């Protein structure tokens, strides 16, 4: 048995799906541990809730996909994504996906509340809030209609008292939808703890796909501009009941430059020529949330990320996007009043006052897209990679050199 965990090391959209896709080609299980249908990932198909392993061409090897207990589960999105995959010709998708009975069910009610609280409209935050307040709804509750209705009405009553007439929600329509879903859902639902225990006792190759990224973690991200779940290795372990001793490799995925979506501190952001060039060449449009903010690589962030997730290796993605740059800048420190900070700060005032220290390296100005091995890369590209390795203290094992599935160099 081997377990490979793939985690985003920046603010998301690093390209985790491509590595997961490659790792899942001969895997027996691909799983997600946390997050919800707002965590977009794209290889050839845009995913949000489902694991990327569903596009594994070797489905006949009994490759299974699993949504773990830490996920918030929006049933309409689950069915619509499965239908989209089926429409695109992917085989046996309904037979290759299972869901833990302990996931929290994300209702349209949560989405309505999210809109009232002026956040993103996915309902992720209110669903996690309900869970922590112990009035959430587990997937197992759905199969007890009277209990399910009681819980939905109790939750709706609480929101009605809080928001009054602003709370526009059709509880009868929601309950009717679940009356339709109930029988169809049954085939996908398993005891998540038992399933993962059996998987870890087998000879399976297991690939775990992290949602979002470290800098969006509820505890260690750039708070408060974060998601509502744990995106760390600890969140993976808890969301899937993994035995930490069974983990073979933890891979941090790092884009060769830095992007983030939405509000929040982004010290290296470039809104001028470089940022525009990165956006145009890199096609920087988020799977879930649209336009991304761009900058050169911020190794302060990557090193901080490694201090929490302790990566065994890194996957550097989209190296080819830098092929035409004459000079490449790398953020290597933050300074306040001339003094270098030890790490990425939690204090937003300190972060606001911090100045970024850059290291400049010559670009390679040669195409990397045809490189099959590490030494096919231009020397300056290798020096860039090796600088990242030395600074972070983790080997760059996987290098993405283009959008194709095969455009990935793996070093020994």
From Swiss-Prot:
GO terms for molecular function: adenylosuccinate synthase activity; GTP binding; magnesium ion binding. Its EC number is 6.3.4.4. This is Adenylosuccinate synthetase. Binds 1 Mg(2+) ion per subunit. One of its GO terms (cellular component) is cytoplasm. Its cofactor is Mg(2+). Keywords: Cytoplasm, GTP-binding, Ligase, Magnesium, Metal-binding, Nucleotide-binding, Purine biosynthesis. IMP binds at residues 13-16, 38-41, 134, 212, 227, 291. GTP binds at residues 12-18, 40-42, 293, 318-320, 400-402. SUPFAM superfamilies: P-loop containing nucleoside triphosphate hydrolases. Pathway: Purine metabolism; AMP biosynthesis via de novo pathway; AMP from IMP: step 1/2. It is found in: Cytoplasm. The active site is at residues 13, 41. Mg(2+) binds at residues 13, 40. Substrate binds at residues 287-293. Belongs to the adenylosuccinate synthetase family. It catalyses: IMP + L-aspartate + GTP = N(6)-(1,2-dicarboxyethyl)-AMP + GDP + phosphate + 2 H(+). NCBIfam families: PRK01117.1 (NF002223), purA (TIGR00184). Homodimer. Plays an important role in the de novo pathway and in the salvage pathway of purine nucleotide biosynthesis. Catalyzes the first committed step in the biosynthesis of AMP from IMP. It comes from Fusarium vanettenii (strain ATCC MYA-4622 / CBS 123669 / FGSC 9596 / NRRL 45880 / 77-13-4). InterPro entries: Adenylosuccin_syn_GTP-bd, Adenylosuccinate_synth_dom1, Adenylosuccinate_synth_dom2, Adenylosuccinate_synth_dom3, Adenylosuccinate_synthetase, P-loop_NTPase.
């Amino acid at each position: 048995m081997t377990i490979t965990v793939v985690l985003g090391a920046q603010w998301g959209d690093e390209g985790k799906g491509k590595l997961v896709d490659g790792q899942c080609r001969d895997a027996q299980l691909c799983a997600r541990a946390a997050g919800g249908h707002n965590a977009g990932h794209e290889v050839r198909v845009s995913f949000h809730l489902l694991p990327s392993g569903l596009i594994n061409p070797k489905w006949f090897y009994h490759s299974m996909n699993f949504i773990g207990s830490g996920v918030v589960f929006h049933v309409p999105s689950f069915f619509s994504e499965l239908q989209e995959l089926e429409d695109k010709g992917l085989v046996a998708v309904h037979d290759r996906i299972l869901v833990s009975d302990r996931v929290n069910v994300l209702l349209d009610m949560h989405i309505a509340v999210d809109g009232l609280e002026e956040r993103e409209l996915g309902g992720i935050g209110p669903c996690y809030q309900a869970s922590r307040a112990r009035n959430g709804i587990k997937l197992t509750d759905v199969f007890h209609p009277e209990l399910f209705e009681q819980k939905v009405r109790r939750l709706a009553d609480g929101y009605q008292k809080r928001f009054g007439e602003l709370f526009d929600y059709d509880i009868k329509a929601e309950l009717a939808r679940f009356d339709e879903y109930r029988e169809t859902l049954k085939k996908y639902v398993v005891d998540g703890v038992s399933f993962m225990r059996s998987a870890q006792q087998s000879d399976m190759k297991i690939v775990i796909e992290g949602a979002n990224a470290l800098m969006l973690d509820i505890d260690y991200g750039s708070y408060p501009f974060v998601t509502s779940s744990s995106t760390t290795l600890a969140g993976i372990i808890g969301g899937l009941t993994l035995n930490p001793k069974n983990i073979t490799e933890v891979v941090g995925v790092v884009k060769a430059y830095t992007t983030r979506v939405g509000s929040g501190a982004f010290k290296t952001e470039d809104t001028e020529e470089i940022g525009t060039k990165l956006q145009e060449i890199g096609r920087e449009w988020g799977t879930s949330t649209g336009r991304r903010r761009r900058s050169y690589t911020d190794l302060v962030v990557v090193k901080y990320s490694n201090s929490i997730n302790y990566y065994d290796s890194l996957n550097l993605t989209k190296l080819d996007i830098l092929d035409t740059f004459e000079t490449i800048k790398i953020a290597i420190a933050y300074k306040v009043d001339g003094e270098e900070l030890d790490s990425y700060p939690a204090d937003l005032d300190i972060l606001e006052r911090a100045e970024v220290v850059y290291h400049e390296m010559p670009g390679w100005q040669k195409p990397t897209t045809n490189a099959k091995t590490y030494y096919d890369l231009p020397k300056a590209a290798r020096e860039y990679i090796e600088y990242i390795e030395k600074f972070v203290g983790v080997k760059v094992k996987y290098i993405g050199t283009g959008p194709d599935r095969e455009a990935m160099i793996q070093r020994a």
